[in-house]
Regions:
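Anion-binding and metal-coordination hotspots
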Residues: 1-18, 24-537
Length: 537
């Protein structure tokens, strides 16, 4: 009997990630920006690439990255011994890149644009927050780096401190070409000008359109954008446009927009969300008399889905308020609500809780020896005025009318969902939270590393879709073989099943491919899975 030693390791998407990291030259850029990190074994750039690949394949705390490297074919693909990826070495690499995060992000982003031919004529900017577990006392944090503190968390965990990140995502493939880490308490409205300057530096001579949420809509930000010659699109904060303006609009005069949301593509025309647009001018004045007055285009948008949602929400609020007011009317004059004051206080609570203050009318009779009674109703004129404003919202833009009509402005803005989807990937497959590191400089560095992983993740998704042609769909991703657009999550899921069978010196390693979709994805990506990250010596 012959006994042979065979070892199997997870191969997954390691060869694919290695190819994209090679084209981006992440290790080379890190080593150029942060020289002096070379040891007898690894450079800072190699360590950072290992962290990027860990996030792409099987995110783990720093102390467990070495264990991940042992079970995955990291040594075979990247030439890195697992024992070298201990938490001390990883922490030193994070400390080394922390002072140069913006420079690394900008250089890698510019490299991605040039190497992969990314169209950056339209960039979508947004910020998100990551809650952090731990005390992180202010006195123990280095103020040269983003400070972890309390803010306005997206996950509503106001009991936890946070750190924030901003992404600029291209309309072409949803590629996060620029990323930056911010203080946990930084106001989003104050970061717009800095983001614009970063994007200008990265884009160089290229002109680009900056699409964002409502944060750019301040006099200071609009002034800076106009002065820099950067066109923008952003929604107007709801408080800046009165419902009376919307209620006075004639929907019949609005222009229909030839655009259908992707989620409605397979629905009958009568069930799809539809949009109509009108246009006027929005005036913005500074606080000082000498400040110039800005007049920019305002696109008034009506959405049938938004209108239906607002109508349902109002009906729900009214129904609950009606139930509680009827109950109060029945209890008026009794032991708990025997006085005008008690009834009035309760009405105030109901009106505030159900958001019906503007339309609720009531009369209290009795008192002074007579039992109190309550009569109430909803003001139908107020409700009709609210209903007339349903579905309307507004966008501001500096794009000249001759370059884009109001319908085109709306279509451009609708791409904002791309950056939101990337944040979903950021917090989902790449597991940005929880962050198990000490010191705010390491937190910032690790988040920037995860942003690099998101860049590779997005480029792989874009490559597969582009290789599929105009339809950008394929079969084999789901058990029922329905035709769908591949997402990064699907791609990494299927490639994650690849294994590497390692024999003895006379038996070369063998890649175990178990499903046809794996071969199809590798073919679409044009990846040679036998090629290692670094030349063999």
């Amino acid at each position: 009997m012959v006994v042979t030693s065979v070892v199997e390791k997870r191969l997954g998407a390691l060869p694919v990630a290695a190819e994209f990291l090679r084209r981006l030259d992440v290790a080379g850029i890190v080593d150029e920006v942060c020289p002096g990190g070379a040891s007898a074994y690894l450079t800072h750039g190699q360590v950072i690439e290992a962290l990027v690949v860990n996030r792409l394949t099987s995110p783990a705390p720093l102390v467990r990255v070495g264990d991940w490297a042992r079970t995955w074919a990291v040594e075979e693909v990247f030439g890195i011994e697992p024992a070298l990826l201990n938490d001390d070495r990883l922490a030193r690499a994070l400390d080394a890149i922390a002072p140069e995060l913006d420079r690394i992000a900008g250089t890698v982003g510019a490299r991605a644009i040039a190497e992969f031919g990314i169209d950056v004529s339209r960039l979508h900017w947004d910020m998100t927050s990551m809650s952090v577990h731990g005390a992180f006392p202010a006195g123990d944090q280095d103020e040269q780096y983003p400070v972890i503190g309390y803010g306005h968390p997206k996950d509503r965990r106001v009991d936890l401190k946070q750190v924030q990140a901003g992404l600029a995502v291209s309309a072409d493939g949803g590629i996060p070409v620029h990323a930056r880490v911010f203080d946990g308490g930084a106001a989003e409205v104050s970061q717009v000008v800095g983001a614009m300057k970063d994007l200008q530096g990265m884009a160089g001579a290229r002109e680009f359109l900056m699409v964002a949420d409502s944060k750019p809509v301040s006099y200071t930000n609009v002034t800076a954008l106009l002065a820099a010659g950067v066109d923008f699109i952003a929604p107007v904060p709801a408080a800046q446009v009165k419902d009376e303006l919307y209620a006075a609009l004639d929907l019949a005069q609005a222009q229909a927009v030839d655009w259908v949301p992707e989620r409605d593509a397979g629905k009958p025309a009568t069930e799809r969300e539809s949009y109509r647009v009108l246009e006027d001018t929005h005036t913005m004045a500074g606080r000082r008399k000498r400040d110039p007055v800005h007049r920019v285009r305002r696109i008034l948008v009506h959405s049938t889905a938004v209108a239906a949602g607002q109508r349902r929400a109002r009906e729900k609020r009214l129904a609950r308020a009606r139930e509680e007011m009827d109950r109060l009317a029945g209890a008026a004059g009794g032991r708990h609500y025997g006085t005008h004051q008690k009834i009035t206080v309760r009405i105030g609570v109901i009106a505030a809780k159900r958001y019906v203050t503007s339309c609720l009318r009531w009369t209290i009779t009795g008192g002074e020896g007579e039992p109190c009674a309550l009569q109430w109703h909803f003001d139908q004129d107020v409700l009709a005025a609210e209903a007339a404003a349903d579905g309307w919202w507004a966008l501001l833009t500096s794009i000249p009318a001759e370059q884009a009509g109001p319908d085109q402005i709306l279509v451009h803005y609708k791409g904002q969902g791309t950056v939101e989807r990337r944040y979903h990937d950021f917090k989902g497959p790449l597991a940005v939270a929880p962050v198990f590191v000490q010191h705010n400089r390491r937190v910032a560095a690790l988040i920037q590393v995860i942003c690099l992983a998101l860049l590779v993740f997005s480029l792989i998704e874009r490559q597969v879709r582009r290789a599929l042609g105009a339809e950008q769909t394929m079969i084999g991703l789901y058990p029922d073989n329905r035709r769908v657009r591949p997402t990064g999550r699907m791609i990494f899921y299927h490639l994650g099943e690849l294994t590497l069978r390692i024999g003895n010196t006379t038996d070369p390693p063998t890649v175990q491919i178990t499903r046809g979709v794996q071969l199809h994805l590798l073919d679409l990506l044009g990846t040679d899975i036998t090629r290692t990250r670094w030349p063999q010596t």
